[in-house]
Each structure stands twice: as structure tokens, then as C-alpha cells.
UniProtKB/Swiss-Prot annotation:
Known EC number: 3.6.1.7
SUPFAM superfamilies with a match to the protein in the record: Acylphosphatase/BLUF domain-like
Coiled-coil region(s): none
Annotated catalysed reactions: an acyl phosphate + H2O = a carboxylate + phosphate + H(+)
Name of the protein this chain belongs to: Acylphosphatase
Species of origin: Bordetella avium (strain 197N)
Keywords: Hydrolase
Keyword Hydrolase listed: yes
Keyword Hydrolase annotated: yes
Length: 94
């Protein structure tokens, strides 16, 4: 049974988000907030992430990802709720 206190979001970040430390900064922020999941660069220039945690933790992470680190320029952020039983143990950069 899915834990109602755990939320999982799949996120796609568009803009100047590669070559600017976005993934590394995302991992640092995830550790600060206590969320789990992963982040990776995609061939089309976007960054994708899976973020899992309490609704409050996930909201704070999403808010940060809309801005990213200082060198990034996020133009669009897509997110969708994932309904799956997979639980992540840590936050990883791929």
C-alpha cells in the first residue's frame, strides 16, 4: 500500500540547465531537504528528475528547481505525480 505521507514527482526542467551545475546543485538541495530520487541530463538539453518525500519537502524542492543554481536559467518546469510503489533510499545524480 502506498504511504499517503510520501509524494513522488517526475520533473522535466527546460532552459539553460546543462553545463551550469544544475544537477550537482540539485543533489545538494535534495540532501538539505531530505528528499530522495534522482536527477540526470537528457540528450535534448533538458534535465529530468524524480523527487520523493513528504508533500512539504517535495513542494520546497519543486520551488527551488524552478530557479535552480545562479548560473541556470529555467524557462519551463513540467511535473507530474507518479503513482508507484518504488521507494528511493537516497538522491543520486546520473
Amino acid at each position: 500500500m502506498q504511504d499517503p505521507n510520501i509524494e513522488t514527482l517526475f520533473i522535466i526542467v527546460h532552459g539553460k540547465v546543462q553545463g551550469v551545475g544544475y544537477r550537482h546543485a540539485t543533489v545538494r538541495r535534495a540532501h538539505m531537504l531530505g528528499v530522495t530520487g534522482w536527477v540526470q541530463n537528457m540528450e535534448n538539453g533538458t534535465v529530468q528528475a524524480m523527487v520523493q518525500g513528504s508533500p512539504d519537502q517535495v513542494d520546497h524542492m519543486l520551488e527551488w528547481m524552478r530557479r535552480g543554481p545562479p548560473a541556470a536559467s529555467v524557462t519551463e518546469l513540467e511535473s507530474r505525480r507518479e503513482d508507484g510503489g518504488r521507494r528511493f533510499k537516497h538522491f543520486a545524480q546520473h
